[in-house]
Amino acid sequence: ILRQISSVGKSEFVPLMQKIYSEPIKESLILQRINDIKEKGGIAALSGTPQAAIKFKETLVNSKIDLFFLQGTVVSTMHIGMDGKETLNIKSLCQSLKVPVVAGNCVTYEVAELLMKAGVAGLMVGIGPGAACTSRGVLGIGIPQATAISDCSSARDDYFKATGRYVPIIGDGGIITGGDICKCLACGADAVMIGSPIAKSSSAPGYGFHWGM
């Protein structure tokens, strides 16, 4: 499948990926992959959108995952499901999973503070700066990464002073060089996520290509 995606032109890969990913997620396959990782002694980190967390909440609660990444273009403390009725309460999710929940993405002091108060163990920060991200062009939203990390790390520090609980900040987006990493750390990030350099490596499954949300 990855070879098929990487072989088509820029105007063709989105419809192709939509077709491929239209296949419903199989609940049994989620558990199977988690068990495969655990049997080999690995750390099972599961990633899902807020909508997926709503749909597969029971699977998450009953699985053997070590941590869960709640990932969306923009994440807040309450999300509405695909049916427009069922909601995901992040505080309840953090309490029910019994494993660390890392949430994102966010870019403001206010939202970072709300997510930390909800119980997340880590925050992913960044909307728009990624090489494969289309948020600024499609949605018209986004904040420069240095500003976003500075604001969210300020919320982290204030929250730590008030509660004694430290929530790491992960810079996510637009981080390609060692200089980019240093800038993020200087602005207050505890760690970074990188995509482009890894996607370009010889062992990457996408053959040098990568695709955004």
Q: Predicted regions: what is each one?
A:
Residues 143-144, 148, 162, 176-180, ...:
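Gly/Ser/Thr/Ala-enriched C-terminal appendages of enzymes
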Residues 1-163, 196-201:
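Active-site entrance/lid segments in N-terminal catalytic domains of soluble metabolic enzymes
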Residues 54, 109-113, 170-181:
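A glycine-rich phosphate-binding loop feature that marks nucleotide/adenosyl-phosphate handling sites
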Residues 99-101, 166-173:
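A short, small-residue-rich loop immediately preceding and capping a beta-strand
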